């Protein structure tokens, strides 16, 4: 059987692509080396932030606004919401370049963002402590996503729509010819007109020339109480320290507050190098500078986990066809800020399989930018 689209890697982007392409009437085969959702890829742990006024650059705003529409639609397929509108407060020095980008994005796209000085911040959320030179940019319409629920929902909807799914079966080789794309797996060979490579952190095992660097990252849960929960209107947050370190975190659930450090980490080359949480001496203390100064009421570390970023050289996404192979789309290099975009990236992949022109300017995400 020849498929219209084969998806290599069925985590967040691949799961979304499988659903949207199958819903559009295409014959789709989703593959994964493991059984998604799993803990081997870039994303695991149950929550991910979604921010609209985007500190990483205005080029992302149209994508994240479309993603929000798709998240809201996906949430209708479950009793438990996938998106929780907790609000997100971005904290940092008043001269922060990241916060300047957030403010610029908000102004250009007329987003609901409120600017608070240090006094106003600490009045609204007495749990937060910041220096006098800090500000907060509060996005009331943003919040967080239940990531594993999202992936399982896409997988279920795709399967119910007739999508073929081949999991626990790594792809060992990809072949291109005039008739399309052939993949080799432990279960045999499969052929399609087009392919999506969304293999996340370990994409270089299949496409070694891609400029993607895996980085081991950790996050942890700390003892909290009801003051830090959504029931008390405590928001999700990003925070920049005076030395430039970037942190992110979520409202407490079951008296546990999850926090991670966005920058830093350990460069690795293979999956077995991703040691578990606490295997690196700094793991347990990584969040202390932020917690001690900004959230001093939070208690000790309860447990943690390790994940992996698939970093591009400039930490912007890679969304492009493989050089010399216009029938194969690669979505990678999401650099630790990609999950919130998963539905729109999946939709872009489905449009690629349908032969449609993208609805967005993807020029900033082309591979050619690295050869200029």
Curated annotation (Swiss-Prot):
Q: Which Pfam families match?
A: DAO
UniProt GO molecular function: flavin adenine dinucleotide binding; N-methyl-L-amino-acid oxidase activity; sarcosine oxidase activity
Q: From what superkingdom does this record's organism come?
A: Bacteria
Tell me which EC number(s) this protein carries: 1.5.3.-
**InterPro entries per record:** FAD-dep_OxRdtase (IPR006076), FAD/NAD-bd_sf (IPR036188), Me_Trp_Oxase_MTOX (IPR023493), MTOX (IPR045170)
| Residues that bind FAD | 4-34
Q: Which residues form the signal peptide?
A: none
- Cofactors, names only: FAD
Residue numbers bearing the S-8alpha-FAD cysteine modification: 307
Instruction: Relay the cofactor remark from the entry.
Output: Binds 1 FAD per subunit.
The UniProt entry, under SUPFAM superfamilies, shows: FAD-linked reductases, C-terminal domain (SSF54373), FAD/NAD(P)-binding domain (SSF51905)
Q: Name one GO cellular component term.
A: cytosol
Q: Which catalysed reactions does the entry list for this protein? A: N(alpha)-methyl-L-tryptophan + O2 + H2O = L-tryptophan + formaldehyde + H2O2
Keywords from UniProt, A to Z, are: FAD, Flavoprotein, Oxidoreductase
| Subunit record text | Monomer.
Q: What does this protein do?
A: Catalyzes the oxidative demethylation of N-methyl-L-tryptophan.
Protein name stated in the entry: N-methyl-L-tryptophan oxidase
